[in-house]
């Protein structure tokens, strides 16, 4: 199966998210319905950095979870069976944070599905920076 890639414009045709809440810049690997790998480049101009935390900017953990969910949504919603639908984050388990993500970092975000039954999908995700684990965990998705 050919691995696909998506630029920001193509991602915005799949996901309803827009600035400041679109948290994936590119998909560099895509196996529809199975897995996706995305990139998020963190700029000092991200809207969350001034308040989290002043003088010590750190990407909020909940936004890292959302970034993994958005990459997963790209994977599932590119499958012909699910095109045109919405993906909702329905649950998280065993999320662990190993290091901080700060301005200038490039996040490598991988999400893959382990099971899909009906309108519910189960998967796992992780974020790495320069091969170093930032965070990871398990997800539950609902399709609307």
UniProtKB/Swiss-Prot annotation:
Highest taxon of source: Bacteria
Enzyme Commission (EC) number: 4.2.1.59
Reactions that this protein is recorded to catalyse: a (3R)-hydroxyacyl-[ACP] = a (2E)-enoyl-[ACP] + H2O
SUPFAM superfamilies per the UniProt record, alphabetical: Thioesterase/thiol ester dehydrase-isomerase
Record keywords: Cytoplasm, Lipid A biosynthesis, Lipid biosynthesis, Lipid metabolism, Lyase
Family matches, as HAMAP family: FabZ
Its biological purpose: Involved in unsaturated fatty acids biosynthesis. Catalyzes the dehydration of short chain beta-hydroxyacyl-ACPs and long chain saturated and unsaturated beta-hydroxyacyl-ACPs.
Entry protein name: 3-hydroxyacyl-[acyl-carrier-protein] dehydratase FabZ
């Amino acid at each position: 199966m050919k691995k696909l890639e998506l630029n920001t414009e193509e991602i915005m045709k799949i996901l309803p998210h827009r600035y400041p809440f679109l948290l994936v810049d590119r998909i560099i690997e895509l196996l529809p319905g199975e897995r996706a790998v995305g990139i998020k480049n963190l700029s000092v101009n991200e809207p969350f950095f001034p308040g989290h935390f002043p003088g010590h900017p750190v990407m909020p953990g909940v936004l890292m979870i959302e970034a993994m969910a958005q990459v997963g949504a790209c994977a599932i919603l590119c499958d012909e069976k699910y095109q045109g639908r919405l993906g909702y984050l329905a649950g998280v388990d065993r999320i662990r944070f190993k290091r901080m993500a700060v301005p200038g970092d490039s996040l490598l975000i991988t999400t893959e599905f382990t099971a899909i039954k009906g309108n519910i999908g189960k998967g796992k995700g992780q974020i790495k920076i320069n091969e170093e684990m930032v965070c990871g965990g398990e997800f539950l998705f609902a399709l609307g």
